[in-house]
Amino acid sequence: MSARRSAIFVNTTDTAVANLVVFEVPAGTAIGAAMRELDLPNKGPEAIVCAKDAEGQLKDLSHVPETTATFTAVPANTDDGRAVIRHSCAHVLAQAVQAEFPGTKLGIGPAIENGFYYDFDAAEPFTPEDLKTIEKRMKKIIKTGQKFERRVYESAEAAAEELKNEPYKLELIQDKGNVDPNSDEATEVGAGELTAYDNVNPRTSEVEWSDLCRGPHIPTTRYIPAFALTRSSAAYWRGDQDNAGLQRIYGTAWEDKESLDAYQTMLAEAEKRDHRRLGTELDLFSFPDDLGSGLPVFHPNGGIVRNEMEDHSRRRHIAAGYSFVNTPHITKQDLFERSGHLGFYKDGMFPPMQVDAEFDEDGNVTKPGQEYYLKPMNCPMHNLIFDSRGRSYRELPLRLFEFGNVYRYEKSGVIHGLTRARGFTQDDAHIYCTEDQLEAELTSVLDFILSLLRDYGLDDFYLELSTRDPKKSVGSDEIWERSTEILNRVATNSGLELVPDPEGAAFYGPKISVQARDAIGRTWQMSTVQLDFNMPERFNLEYTSSDGSKQQPIMIHRALFGSIERFFGVLLEHYAGAFPAWLAPHQVMGIPVADDCIPHLETITAQLREKGIRADVDTSDDRMQKKIRNHTTGKVPFMLLAGARDVEANAVSFRFLDGTQVNGVPVDEAIAVISSWIGDRINDQPSEDSIAARR
């Protein structure tokens, strides 16, 4: 029976492939065999590397369905295709490491965003020279065209016997069935059969190497056209610092060399923009060891930027009808039991504190203490504010907002500067409304989010819709279906691209997340809008409706920046340290040609300060050119130069970060230009051309 082919349009984030091929595979026929009649590519960036079944599960091309089934061809230049290539490349990496460093034990090796990694228990840390050696071995393996062949173990005991010299694999086999399906370990074991993948020599049919793995994989190693190892680091087995220390090697793999080159160029640019490095260079923030991991402090320069961010957000929220509240950092255990957080989120919370216990003179407890927790979220406390008095339908929608400090226990291996911290400030809102108001309020909230993000210079967005994880959720099927349908409609009506995130929602409701692309094309999750029919019920929240009956409000969780710290880090990298003038810690710096020009510049900067502009004069002993270099490095958007002619003409010269200059601008005009540029919150850096256009 021949495979039947039909082309359908698929809503996808993959720009290279919008039209994917759907075909039918007869029972007892391998997918790859059925696909041969379709004349689909097996080389190049559109080579078909695997297939997707009707349930969305990826399958090897060697997979043989028991009944006739429909599959979608998955090209290399799609997100799914790249993920399979990267996971297969991780296997090649592990094979190469064990060949070059005999005795090395295997951890896990999943595909991750833009790449892959593999963890190893090695005798010594891997050096840059080691990575070069490993890369050479990998290229040899790829060139031989080894086949990836799936093999099912007869039993867990059979797998354990085969892998008896791989202690980490043995642990995974023992844990089969208890592994989080969303964890990296699920790459190796999970639901279904216990399987291995053998790397088979195509000439001799001998197994060159094998690994415990669920798959799927590419047909042969030749389907890895472009890869690179990027770095090595220390890691803990299963991400737990109480476990064994391992060595992790990271790599990336792509559908062609051009894509790899583009990614490596982006990586080099991202390294220059790393907010941790820029934070030190620009004296914005630090992470003192005395405080502990993931706990930042903001220096005066960073404090200015942060305050400007918060102040603008505060003004916009007030104008949009939000009411500001404030809640404490800790609370009794009972509140988080009531909210459900202890049942569903305890692993992400810091351990409790014992407070108010009483003891006799011998140290015996006479009155047990009360357990308190650092809050990981603000929503339970906002519910208490709503419930502090009777509410009328006339008060709804009620929009409560705060810059609330929260604390979440993140494993040390995932902490990353400001973008993944343990203590941070959420710009957190909770909106209580009626069911009739819900869709309009969600639409208004999403519009407000996008408008405010654009104020800070982000304007390339798409949306993700996260839906229910049946294993981690509360509430009825009906409530989840209804809330998901409403969110989907609001997201679709926004006109932005909508990407599904199956089972990605929190336990209390589905959510929309706003994803923003930065100046170099990276994607950052920004805002979240989460619908919650459940928590109002847990807190018995009520309002009096127009007919006098008591009704339960619907609750919307909304974090716009995600966190102030994270948004700060994203903007810092987006602008490569050169914040827009309205956010910059130092907005104007006067640079005299000679000391006798200092009074002239001090008069100008004094007038600017009266207008609320951050302006200073560099009176150091450095020469003028060094001062220009220093303040260019310091990302000051307006540098004002003054020499004898400027003093005589009551003028000043502009110097900009791009090296351009505008000379002899009358002082009143210069002040007006700077004031309007900052007052209008223009996010572009000023330059000769842009200033000329405003004169």
UniProtKB/Swiss-Prot annotation:
Enzymatic reactions: tRNA(Thr) + L-threonine + ATP = L-threonyl-tRNA(Thr) + AMP + diphosphate + H(+)
EC number: 6.1.1.3
Pfam families linked to this entry: HGTP_anticodon (PF03129), tRNA-synt_2b (PF00587), tRNA_SAD (PF07973)
SMART domains the record matches: tRNA_SAD
Gene Ontology biological process terms, A to Z: threonyl-tRNA aminoacylation
Record-annotated TGS domain positions: 6-75
Keywords, sorted A to Z: Aminoacyl-tRNA synthetase, ATP-binding, Cytoplasm, Ligase, Metal-binding, Nucleotide-binding, Protein biosynthesis, RNA-binding, tRNA-binding, Zinc
Top-level class of the enzyme under EC nomenclature: ligase
Cofactor note: Binds 1 zinc ion per subunit.
A GO-annotated cellular component: cytoplasm
Functional summary from the UniProt entry: Catalyzes the attachment of threonine to tRNA(Thr) in a two-step reaction: L-threonine is first activated by ATP to form Thr-AMP and then transferred to the acceptor end of tRNA(Thr). Also edits incorrectly charged L-seryl-tRNA(Thr).
Subunit description: Homodimer.
Name used for this protein in its record: Threonine--tRNA ligase
